[in-house]
């Protein structure tokens, strides 16, 4: 949704501002969303939680274990189910009538059904939190130390000289690059994760970072 700074403030004052945060898992979306909800009274909707509730998973770890890795049996079918569930959850979040809605999307929001993604883009101010190059290694490590379900969308391939896990690490930058392009295509605003995660960035500065340039 293309809006200027005046529209941004006016919608916020009326309780009609709609923001969607997009980007990779562990890049700082939930951290940002929680801070904004606490200090600026946004109505936060966490799509991950909607999906977990629908599927009966108690934690993100349970969800990740159910989905598995792209080299495990049945992954393709479970990946398809995940996208279907995410489409339903994202549609539900978009339909919210709450004041100043803030959607914390999943990293795979770009794979939901086209009509739902289009509805999100047309009705929400989309903020993309882009992975700073200094954070890429941390994201890879977080993926294994703090598992989250990840849609690989055919970007994983087994490398002959590497184990399946080593192949995941090797293919991760390719997945990041493919997603970067997809995120940028739907973003109204791009913010570096270096700004989002910087402890010196206070909540007021964070709110300003979100706003349109003009």
Annotated model-derived regions:
Residues 106-110, 132-134, 196:
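Short glycine-rich anion-binding loops that position phosphate/pyrophosphate groups of nucleotides
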Residues 26:
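Walker A (P-loop) phosphate-binding loop of P-loop NTPases
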Residues 50-118:
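ATP-dependent small-molecule kinase phosphotransfer cores
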Residues 21:
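Hydrophobic anchor at the beta1->P-loop junction of P-loop NTPases
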Residues 30:
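Walker A/P-loop
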Residues 1-16, 35, 39, 100, ...:
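NTP-dependent small-molecule kinase module
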Residues 122-178:
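A glycine- and Lys/Arg-enriched "phosphate-lid" helix/loop adjacent to the NTP-binding pocket
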Residues 38-47:
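Post-Walker A helix-loop "phosphate-sensing" segment adjacent to the P-loop in P-loop NTPases
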């Amino acid at each position: 949704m293309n809006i200027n700074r005046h529209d941004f403030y006016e919608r916020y004052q009326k309780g009609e501002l709609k923001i969607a945060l997009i980007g990779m898992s562990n890049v700082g979306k939930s951290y940002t969303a929680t801070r904004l909800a606490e200090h600026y009274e946004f109505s936060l909707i966490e799509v991950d939680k909607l999906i977990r509730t629908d599927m009966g998973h108690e934690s993100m770890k349970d969800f990740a274990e159910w989905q598995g890795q792209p080299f495990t049996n049945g992954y393709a079918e479970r990946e398809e189910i995940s996208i279907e569930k995410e489409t339903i959850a994202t549609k539900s979040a978009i339909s919210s009538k709450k004041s100043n809605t803030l959607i914390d999307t999943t990293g795979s929001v770009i794979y939901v059904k086209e009509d739902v993604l289009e509805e999100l883009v047309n009705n929400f101010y989309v903020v993309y939190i882009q992975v700073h190059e200094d954070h890429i290694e941390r994201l890879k490590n977080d993926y294994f130390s703090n598992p989250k379900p990840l849609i690989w969308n055919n970007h994983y391939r087994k490398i002959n000289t590497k184990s399946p896990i080593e192949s995941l690490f090797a293919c991760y930058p390719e997945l990041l690059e493919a997603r970067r392009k997809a995120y940028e295509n739907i973003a109204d605003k791009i913010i570096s994760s270096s700004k989002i995660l910087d402890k010196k960035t206070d909540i007021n500065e964070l709110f300003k970072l979100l706003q349109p340039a003009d």
